[in-house]
């Protein structure tokens, strides 16, 4: 961050002191007599996002606030009376004006006096002809030239930091001056008055003021500025340690964050703010020093830029529509919605924050709980329910998960506490943040090395970074820098590290850095201990292993001459000195096999050894030293007598295993040195390779990971190339091939420039398709890469395939249109017409007509109904046409097949002929023409039964009593069964269901007849097919309309009754079935039997039917 010029006489806050406590409640009235002295430490300890002290009071001008804070550093006893009086009058005047008390009489008097002073100052300005003259006036009053205090040219240019790494630009900046108001690079603000003032119609809003332009009507404020500057400069010389309120550590806004605005400033233009360029953030290594008054992340703004224009302040005081902030804590409430905390406060205060569990708004009086990980706010009851629900349980952990950040908590919250956790069940106050206690937060920064606590009032969201500063040593420990407390970044200076490296000889030449230094990079040449090998290594390698001659071991035999002068060192390359000769007499104490001490052999008469060249005496026992052959269970030993030197070859055999240990074989020990100790068996490995596609199939395999050596070879997504990697599991990678030709769309308007990855589809084009189409209709689809264009959807008129009608609104791409009507074309047989729906092509094709023949039969007149046989005669078949037969009285009706009816007539005719035999035997003639004509065959009738006879008797009885047939005295019409036989059969299976249906239908018919509506419907519940069929059949009897809806198994029936059409039958179906189920009475017994005259015709008696006795046949 670019450093502003240090303020002379600035002081530094002690953050560890007891007074470093943020003010909990700001005094709302600066004009109160008991609270006139402001504590500058409290002003400085406000939060980074709190407004500066110049904003805390109700629109007090910057001049008055500056005066207030200049006097606030004196003790109460040492403050000059003149300053106290000035402070009281200034604060009182401003505070009263800000509260809108201009209408009071005493206030009007003060306004008039002030107006007189303004006119006098205006006259003083009129006397000055130019800017130098005005400058001389200020110089004469203050005794100091204004230009002498301007900073250097290097300090005037403050470069704005570009976050994208662009070259910094020189921006026009406000520079430090002791005058009132900003000064732009060498020009005083008083010189701005000579510029052209914009026209009123071209000016901005009322409160908007262009940067660097002063209106003519603000000259009175300029004059007062010139007069008052001398006194202020003298005050500054007397008290150099005082700081302005906007320089207080806690009162400056943080860079990158917009400070909260007052209500009166929200409608003003930001032109004055735009003139201040951003202060770039420099690296800590490049900054030479840090000002004691700089707070690290707080922008340093000049005093002149902090002071408001008197004219603007006056306009705001006189504007009745500008709302001022209420007094109390709400003035300092965090309102920056760009931060997490500011957004939470804004939403909770306005009751626009929603609970993530119930999706309801969080009210200011509702108990809440805030997650300490993500800082989301929930209703307390909602988070309790969530924590106890199975969905909140953490996998593999004991606890419950936060609905927002999934952070696992061990305990379920049961109490309603404020955000800082100090107060339970906090009461809501209109002047405080909802759900907060109003006290200082004092929470520690988690995970940071910061001893300070949060100095904000109790707030939601994360605590801001610690505003305190601390002195931190750089990594090399040579320089000190002032950094933010708890800042995790390390401090680096621009000096070399100069620490001793790992070699202990050289120093680190890198710049100040963190962590251990890199190993020494100097290359040295080292020699092994035996001097036969050398190597080049980095300095510091194998430190402490040097023996003065060599630095490492080369793993070769040493070979140096021993002290005995007869033997050489047989050890591996080692540091000096070599071990003494192992054959010296004082070192050899046992025989060569090691079983017998030499002292015993000397006692037995063996000669003693004097030099290393003398042989070692043998004990004469078996050597017994272990040999390298054999197995773990049985170790072979040397079978020779005690001897010097190596043992000879073993004369035994050893068992060795193959590589995979699947098979073994036996070999002589003498051949183990010439042959390999292992062999390969012929077993093939059947395990799958890592690719999962192939088997290993290796002979005597010993691999743990069976890698597949084959190439994958599968086609890639591009469809052009194959995978060239070793065979693997899963999907292949994308094709790495690329084309260096341009890939264009079909029309060439859109282009993808090379390199083009293989498999890339042509680019999408927004141009209209330019291909040649089959039709001449307008084209509405875009350019495409498919070979075939999408179908044309232009609506046209087309004939159907059978040329029956001209169809409209048919899309152009549809070719074969069917109208849905029967074809009706005459078939090749000439007798039938095509019954297919409107179709394409020929009606029959290779097939023949199979429709039934319509030629009438000769015997019955019904159609032939045989498959179409063209010109061939009709085949002789039985007629299967259905006809209706009736009895003589017409009561009985039955539908029968024509062939069955003719056979019945023949049976009746045979019976009639048998009854005429007697007449033929007597010589009488018999009329048989009626029995064999076709007319009689068509007039075949059924036989009357007992009911027909009963009905006939009732008719005669009615005629005898002269009863009219219209009255239906015997209920003949209603007794005629309206229920079909199939309905009766179905109803017998479930009489209770039929009874319930009849009751519903009767109630429906009565309701529609009595009600106002002409139609009324009833919906039956879903039922099976048999029950639905019963309802349909009964609906016909009752005159109801029945329709089935839905699909199985939810298919049901809805019946509708229509007034005048629906009627209840006189006899219900259940009544008819109950009557039929009753036992029938036996027929009447005949008193005499009629016999024929010829008793000899026994066959005729068997054929003839017994006559029915008619008791009502009365002869007149």
UniProtKB/Swiss-Prot annotation:
Renumbered residue ranges of the record's region Disordered: 38-57, 71-322, 1069-1102
Ranges of biased composition (kind: Basic and acidic residues): 146-159, 188-202, 222-252, 280-289, 306-319
Enzyme Commission code: 2.3.2.-
Root EC class: transferase
Positions bearing Phosphoserine: 50, 82, 95, 129, 150, 324
InterPro entries in alphabetical order: NFX1_fam, R3H_dom, R3H_dom_sf, R3H_NF-X1, Znf_NFX1, Znf_PHD-finger, Znf_RING
Zinc finger (RING-type) residue numbers: 355-406
Pfam families in the record: R3H, zf-NF-X1
Domain called R3H: residue spans: 991-1059
Cross-referenced CDD domains: NF-X1-zinc-finger, R3H_NF-X1, RING-CH-C4HC3_NFX1
Zinc finger (NF-X1-type) in chain: 450-468, 503-522, 564-583, 629-652, 691-710, 718-737, 829-851, 860-881
Keywords carried by this UniProt record: DNA-binding, Metal-binding, Nucleus, Phosphoprotein, Repeat, Repressor, Transcription, Transcription regulation, Transferase, Ubl conjugation pathway, Zinc, Zinc-finger
Gene Ontology cellular component terms for the protein in this record: nucleus
An example Gene Ontology biological process: negative regulation of transcription by RNA polymerase II
Gene3D superfamilies noted in UniProt: R3H-like domain
Ranges for region Interaction with PABPC1 and PABC4: 9-26
The protein's role, per its UniProt record: Binds to the X-box motif of MHC class II genes and represses their expression. May play an important role in regulating the duration of an inflammatory response by limiting the period in which MHC class II molecules are induced by interferon-gamma. Together with PABPC1 or PABPC4, acts as a coactivator for TERT expression. Mediates E2-dependent ubiquitination.
The family this protein is said to belong to: Belongs to the NFX1 family.
Subunit structure of this chain's protein: Interacts with PABPC1 and PABPC4.
Domains (record comment): The RING-type zinc finger domain interacts with an ubiquitin-conjugating enzyme (E2) and facilitates ubiquitination.
Protein name: Transcriptional repressor NF-X1
Organism: Bos taurus
UniProt gene name: NFX1
